[in-house]
Swiss-Prot record:
Keywords: Aminoacyl-tRNA synthetase, ATP-binding, Cytoplasm, Ligase, Nucleotide-binding, Protein biosynthesis. A motif ('KMSKS' region) lies at residues 630-634. This is Leucine--tRNA ligase. Coiled coil: none annotated. It comes from Bradyrhizobium sp. (strain ORS 278).
Length: 874
């Protein structure tokens, strides 16, 4: 038995060097074994990894190591999502070039990732800001353009006049730019868009086949795509009330059955009818300006008070020319959805009800719940959105909702105005085409040229990549490419005249929408992929990342893969066969009396009779223990992975990340549990060394027979092997760790016996120790390598095959059943695993505890739940 402690600080770098020197994690594309592609979402090179990265990449690494041991040709690459705004901010704030800042950060973070002991194929590494990467992205842009999947169109955008850039809706806060604070303007601008809507139905339908994706992620994508079946209705406008040239208002509704409950029409502030009305109404113009000041982010709209302005325009009900509806400009109607106009049926829509209650428009219920008297059914403060029968709806009365929808559609489809039907059944999608133009320097240049004679001209493929210039300055607001004295000035490749480059760059979501395909052959200099290789290695078998990317990144990647298929780069539709969303790492917060946050490293926790107390280590002053929250710099509740690895080793950090909770749930950081993981590492080290001593005289060949003790140990070993194997396959890593601990206890019990083990038990001990080390090797690979050598193996455990389960050892000779009398537990009974019901019944009725509980009463029946419970009813 060794008296030395396991020294992670010495061992971990040594094993990492061996892995690198032997290139054991390098994947060969021509390997004939079945492939397994595991990928974690690649990081943005911000400068340092955080503890959430450790969890994310550990999850993938466990799976990669396991599948490699199972005999798969594992592809487990790493790269950098390297374009983006933070690099430009750093250039402005720190006077450092975005390129230098980015590559310095990559070098620092790569060193950190290596220290975690990840089984990555670093030979495939790239950054999306490498010209050798975005060259192929530009080529695909041109391919997509030729295939009709890229267009240039006028779009209304949020323009920051100080930063001189387009802002996403989410970047407009109270009508001002999130960074500059300038009042945001609405502008019409030419934008490059990917035609993702061409795949709306396909993207929706294919979700049904993604059965290894979380249901919540698929639901989020369904809602984002937002398929709705309804009716497009052309409401006539009262000519006495409308601006010149306006005659009708088109709305799309999924509830045409509620037309007789309509009380108002509402249009977006951007609707042409609103603009026409505002031209002659200063008050309306001011109201529209206020709406635009608040912004059009969905969150802002949802939380803002519902407001409207009566334009004075009146719409005519399609079934009653004498019935007109007021047309409001409302702050909750967006031009991006449907037609930018709705009719409001307040009795059956809560938002509409709140609106009419504010403006005194009243409501008329038109759907009555089954079993309720229509004469007494009224709506006050809560809209009814359930099923029922139609009321107050003339020719629809008595119909179901479905019948009423169909009847309204039939009637309006058959009525004409101006040679076209008043109603038309339509399928609408919430999904909009993907605008990719960004007025930023640090992004992939869009490979087109603008010529006064030839208009938009693609950059010839032979001239790719269009490389970003390094000599840019950020002393002026706006896009540094616009200010560059020479970069944008070129010769038109079509006519030879003077022309200019496109100075917009691509949305960084484009960069991450195909990187997984590039990893299959990043050495191809002439094409984005090598189709034969990509088609063999794709799709990604297991993708791992945060749920915050459930919509945009995953949806864009699904579109991009289809577009790549349409242009001949891959043959599959879906990029990710399996998707796993891990939880966050969270931590307590600590605050001084004045409310300032304190770093956990500066706090000492004391546990006494009154519970936990926090004090500032330096001064001893009391610190308030706040709620457990997501780690953030602002609340100073972060933990530096380097500190943990330096203090305890990477394996301890990995083990803690896997053991505390299911991987799809948040894990609460706890110094105490980290220390517990460190103690367990030392315990495993001792167990392995003790096992070597105990099995020193074990026979080299397997004994013909095993004693009860040896057989029990072998059953524990193979039972743990079976459970951990299944647990890793299901990504139930925390359960796996519990089984490993349980098995370690069983081995420790054997080793604790003072007697020298018989040869069969010594052989079983050696086998058990080997299985134990292999079980924890995906989670704690450095410790496993060290233990593997102690066990006498010459090779690396990272190259060893996963042990075979001996199924006959999983068959239990006996089973223990809970015994109840009249539903109350009275004890347990152990019987043969193949015992029949009469034998079980006899054994149970013979128990003293059962006899006492029955107290002489006759047994009426015995209920046996197989392999679980026996309930005696007396």
């Amino acid at each position: 038995m060794t008296s030395e402690r396991y020294n992670a600080r010495e061992a971990e770098p040594r094993w990492q060097r061996q892995w690198d020197e032997k290139a054991i994690f390098a994947t060969k594309n021509d390997d004939p074994r079945p492939k397994y592609y595991v990928l974690e979402m690649f990081p943005y090179p911000s400068g340092r990894i955080h503890i959430g990265h450790v969890r994310n990449y550990t999850l993938g690494d466990v799976l990669a190591r396991f599948m490699r041991a199972k005999g798969f040709n594992v592809l487990h690459p790493m790269g950098w999502d390297a374009f983006g705004l933070p690099a430009e901010n750093a250039a402005i704030e720190r006077k450092v070039a975005p390129k230098a800042w980015t590559y310095d950060n990559i070098a620092a973070m790569k060193k950190q990732l290596r220290s975690i002991g990840l089984s990555l194929d670093w030979a495939r590494e790239f950054a999306t800001c490498d010209p050798s990467y975005y060259k192929h992205q530009q080529k695909m842009f041109l391919d997509f353009m030729q295939a009709g999947l890229v267009e240039r169109e006028q779009r209304k955008v949020n323009w920051d006049p100080v930063d001189m850039t387009v802002l996403a809706n989410e970047q407009v806060i109270d009508g001002r730019g999130w960074r500059s604070g300038a009042v945001v303007e609405q502008r019409e601008m030419n934008q490059w868009v990917f035609k993702i809507t061409k795949y709306s139905q396909e993207l929706l339908d294919a979700l049904d086949g993604l059965d290894r994706w979380p249901d919540k992620v698929r639901l989020m994508q369904r809602n984002w795509i937002g398929r709705s079946e309804g009716l497009l209705i052309r409401f006539a406008l009262d000519p006495k009330t409308v601006p010149a040239g306006e005659s009708e208002l088109k709305i799309f509704t999924t509830r045409p059955d509620t037309l007789f409950g309509a009380k108002f029409m509402a249009i977006s502030a951007d609707h042409p009818l609103a603009q026409a009305a505002a031209a002659k109404n200063p008050e309306l113009a001011a109201f529209i300006a206020e709406i635009k000041r608040i912004g059009t982010a969905q969150e802002a709209i949802d939380t803002a008070e519902k407001q409207g302005f009566d334009t004075g325009i009146r719409a005519v009900h399609p079934f009653d020319p004498s019935w007109t509806l007021p047309v409001y400009v409302a702050n909750f109607v967006l031009m991006e959805y449907g037609t930018g106009a709705i009719f409001g049926c307040p009795a059956h829509d809560q938002r509409d009800l709140d609106f009419v209650n504010k403006y005194g428009l009243g409501n008329t219920p038109v759907v009555c719940p089954e079993g309720q008297d229509p004469a007494s059914f009224v709506i006050t403060d809560t809209a009814y959105d359930g099923d029922g029968r139609m009321i107050n709806s003339r020719f629809l009365d008595g119909m179901t909702i479905a019948q009423a929808k169909d009847e309204v559609a039939k009637r309006l489809e058959s009525e004409q105005r101006g040679g076209s039907p008043i109603g038309e059944r339509q399928v609408n999608f919430r999904l909009r085409d993907w605008g990719i133009s960004r007025q930023r320097y640090w992004g992939c240049p869009i490979p087109v040229i603008h010529c006064a004679t030839c208009d938009v001209v693609p950059v010839p493929a032979g001239d790719l990549p269009v490389v970003l210039p390094d000599d840019v300055t950020f002393d002026k607001p706006g896009n540094a490419l616009d200010h560059h004295p020479t970069w944008k000035h070129v010769t038109c490749p079509k006519c030879g005249g003077k022309a200019t480059r496109e100075t917009d760059t691509m949305d960084t979501f484009v960069d991450s929408s195909w990187y997984f395909a590039r990893f299959t052959d990043p050495w191809n200099e002439t094409a984005p992929t090598t189709p034969a290789v990509a088609n063999r290695m794709m799709p990604v078998d297991q993708y791992i990342g945060g749920v915050e990317h459930a919509i945009l990144h995953l949806l864009y990647s699904r579109f991009f893969t289809r577009a790549m298929k349409a242009t001949g780069h891959v043959a599959m539709d879906e990029p990710f066969a399996g998707m796993f969303t891990q939880g966050m790492v969270v931590h307590e917060t600590y605050q001084k009396a004045d409310g300032t946050y304190v770093n956990p490293a500066d706090v000492k926790i004391e546990v006494g009779g009154n519970g936990r107390r926090a004090v500032l280590t330096a001064t001893g002053e009391d610190i308030t223990i706040g709620p457990i929250e997501k780690m953030s710099k602002s609340k100073k509740n972060t933990v530096d992975p380097d500190d943990i690895i330096e203090s305890y080793g990477a394996d301890v950090a990995r083990w803690f990340m896997l053991s505390d909770s299911p991987p799809d749930r948040d894990v609460i950081w706890s110094d105490e549990r980290v220390q517990g993981a460190a103690r367990f590492v030392q315990r495993l080290w001792r167990l392995v060394n003790e096992s070597v001593a105990a099995s020193a005289e074990a026979p080299s060949s397997r004994p013909a027979n095993f004693s009860a003790d040896a057989l029990a140990l072998r059953k524990a070993a193979h039972g743990a092997l079976d459970k951990v194997t299944g647990g890793i396959e299901r990504l139930h890593f925390n359960v796996c760790l519990a089984h490993i601990r349980e098995f370690a206890n069983a081995l420790a019990d054997v080793l604790a016996k003072p007697a020298k083990p018989a040869p069969d038990l010594a052989w079983a001990t050696r086998e058990a120790a080997g299985i134990l080390v292999q079980l924890f090797s995906p989670m704690m690979p450095h410790l496993a390598e060290e233990c593997w050598q102690v066990l006498g193996h010459s090779g690396l455990i990272s190259e060893a095959s996963w042990p075979q389960i001996e199924r006959d050892l999983l068959v239990e000779d006996s089973m223990t059943l809970v015994v109840q009398v009249n539903g109350k537990k009275r004890g347990e009974v152990t019987v043969a695993s193949n015992a029949q019901n009469p034998e079980i019944e006899s054994a149970v009725l013979a128990l003293d505890a059962v006899k006492v509980a029955l107290d002489g009463k006759p047994v009426r029946k015995v209920i046996i739940v197989p392999k679980r419970i026996v309930n005696v009813v007396g």
